[in-house]
Amino acid sequence: MRSAFAVLFLALIAITYSKNYEDVKEEIKNEVENEILKDLEEDVNEFDDNVQEEVNDARPLRRFFRRIRGRKLLPYVPTAIKLWNLGKK
């Protein structure tokens, strides 16, 4: 009878330890993920700073054209073509 209680007691300890182990494992995993994300954010910020410096080094006219993006002008292209054709007729 004592051996049965000993086995049950050891099984209870093993189950308790395994749940705690899983919790600790999950916490470590979350901490590692957070550290990786922080490092990536720092790298992205450094990259953005470097790009901004390169843009500021360009000539003023080139900076002006870089600010004008194709996406901003794209909706106006069909209207410009119609006006161009209208002016030719």
Swiss-Prot record:
<keyword id="KW-0732">Signal</keyword>
<keyword id="KW-0027">Amidation</keyword>
<feature type="signal peptide">
    <location>
        <begin position="1"/>
        <end position="18"/>
    </location>
</feature>
<feature type="modified residue" description="Leucine amide">
    <location>
        <position position="86"/>
    </location>
</feature>
<keyword id="KW-0399">Innate immunity</keyword>
<keyword id="KW-0472">Membrane</keyword>
<comment type="similarity">
    <text>Belongs to the arminin family.</text>
</comment>
<keyword id="KW-0391">Immunity</keyword>
<protein>
    <recommendedName>
        <fullName>Arminin 7591</fullName>
    </recommendedName>
</protein>
<keyword id="KW-1053">Target membrane</keyword>
<keyword id="KW-0929">Antimicrobial</keyword>
<keyword id="KW-0044">Antibiotic</keyword>
<dbReference type="GO" id="GO:0005576">
    <property type="term" value="C:extracellular region"/>
</dbReference>
<comment type="function">
    <text>Antimicrobial peptide with a broad-spectrum antimicrobial activity. Keeps its antibacterial activity under a wide range of salt concentrations that mimic physiological conditions of human blood, which is surprising, since Hydra is an obligate freshwater animal with nearly no salt tolerance. Does not affect red blood cells.</text>
</comment>
<keyword id="KW-0964">Secreted</keyword>
<keyword id="KW-1052">Target cell membrane</keyword>
<feature type="propeptide">
    <location>
        <begin position="19"/>
        <end position="58"/>
    </location>
</feature>
